[in-house]
């Protein structure tokens, strides 16, 4: 096989290669789109990009472009999570190959056709290909849910397993992966329901632009619920995958898995409930968030001491000093950084978002709309 053939085989058949390809596409897209940002516009870079690439940007269509851009960014992210799941959770090999192939074709089609439709003229063919790409990603999710079915006795755990399981042997971590997958499919369908009405009375909106609109339409509420739950489920999936990386097990694992399952289900119900039960939906979402946050906290409680212990054992140190323990904790920046990010992100993003939602009328609605909009956009990003 030629050198190019070997590289292509690596990029499109191995987990590392597939992830690298998705990250590269996302990075190139981010680099391109950053030239259209506010600061770049002030320096004249935006106009250069538009002229050189022949972009067709109409200000009245900005919201639609942003929606397509968000989806073009998130499809590779979803694909990366799928790759990690098929590589780290036991499923049949042929299922893994089929799922990875489908989601790869889907996200690549969605990204390039979506950006083409949004920024380079509104070709109906590109719009159709965008929908085909999204549909393929959705179909890959359906296959993943089937492959992850946790009540398949082939994947039951023994009674003495250190991993969370029921008395009958059902692997609760596998249940958590399956629940998140099914919830993601349902939440994607919620967004698709709103998207299906484009051109039939539904106009594109950005959630941050209608936060103080006293009466929101059913489809606008569906968009708000869709964007919140999709981000939340991506976060929970990342937590579950980190648990696999750290070989999360034992007492804290048995506590965390039920909480993550309950949190995922509760948050999903709450976000879907925004459509019909707006007055109580936030309370349901808060409850689910607390369960999920507790599960993530237990991973940190397990992971940090495990990092210290593993490195001290490698260095054959029995009675470590405080400095040696800190060195052991920080020695692997990737693993420490992943755990630290859980703490940092929750204090600076999740808790801030919940606090804002609880105090909307009391505090934040007294602020100028511009300030509230900035806070919301920062929280979501």
Label for each model-derived stretch:
Residues 17-48, 61-90, 95-117, 131-152, ...:
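Hydrophobic cores of alpha-helical transmembrane segments in multi-pass integral membrane proteins
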Residues 46-61, 205-217, 364-373:
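Perimembrane loop-to-helix junctions flanking transmembrane segments
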Residues 90, 155-156, 246-247, 308-311, ...:
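Membrane-interfacial segments
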Residues 114-124, 271-280, 362:
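Juxtamembrane "helix-exit" motif on the non-cytosolic side of transmembrane helices
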Residues 126, 163, 167-168, 251-254, ...:
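Interfacial loop-to-transmembrane junctions
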